[in-house]
């Protein structure tokens, strides 16, 4: 009986994956690594140093501070970055790593950005908080 139940779950999962389901229209935040000790978490108004790699859903990389060897610096919560970043890095600890899946409404919307990010693109960012000032 357990085998039949497990087989049914696997079949349902495969059907869901192969259906070409539309990505979520909500920000998705996955914690990949969190330090054991965290005395300070990011909050609105903090100036952050972050390493990131940005890709589209198809895996095409469009930008990476890691490749440049220089962390990106910005002030959180004041509109210096896309809304998905402002929301997605709140509450992070130095050393923490997250995966952000950002819908178009919190990214670059219908217009896209340059020639590397088409309009209505979901964005995937692997981010690591390097420092808080």
From Swiss-Prot:
Transmembrane segments: none annotated. Inhibited by both FK506 and rapamycin. Residues 45-133 form the PPIase FKBP-type domain. One of its GO terms (molecular function) is peptidyl-prolyl cis-trans isomerase activity. Coiled coil: none annotated. GO terms for biological process: chaperone-mediated protein folding. The keyword Nucleotide-binding does not apply. Keywords: Isomerase, Rotamase, Signal. InterPro entries: FKBP2/11, PPIase_dom_sf, PPIase_FKBP_dom. It holds the Pfam family FKBP_C. It catalyses: [protein]-peptidylproline (omega=180) = [protein]-peptidylproline (omega=0). Its EC number is 5.2.1.8. Residues 1-20 form the signal peptide. It comes from the Eukaryota. Belongs to the FKBP-type PPIase family. PPIases accelerate the folding of proteins by catalyzing the cis-trans isomerization of proline imidic peptide bonds in oligopeptides. This is FK506-binding protein 2. The lineage of its organism: Eukaryota, Amoebozoa, Evosea, Eumycetozoa, Dictyostelia. The gene is fkbp2.
């Amino acid at each position: 009986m357990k085998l039949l139940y497990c087989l049914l779950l696997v079949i349902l999962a495969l059907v869901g994956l192969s259906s070409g389901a539309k990505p979520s229209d909500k920000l998705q935040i996955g914690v990949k690594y969190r330090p054991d000790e965290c005395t300070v978490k990011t909050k609105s108004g903090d100036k952050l140093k972050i390493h990131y790699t940005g890709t589209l859903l198809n895996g095409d990389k469009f930008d990476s501070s890691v490749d440049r060897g220089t962390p990106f610096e910005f002030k959180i919560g004041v509109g210096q970055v896309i809304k998905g970043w402002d929301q997605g890095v709140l509450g992070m600890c130095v050393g923490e790593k997250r995966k952000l899946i950002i819908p178009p409404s919190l990214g670059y919307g219908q217009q896209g950005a340059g020639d590397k990010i088409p309009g209505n693109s979901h964005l995937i960012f692997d981010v690591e908080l390097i420092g808080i000032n």
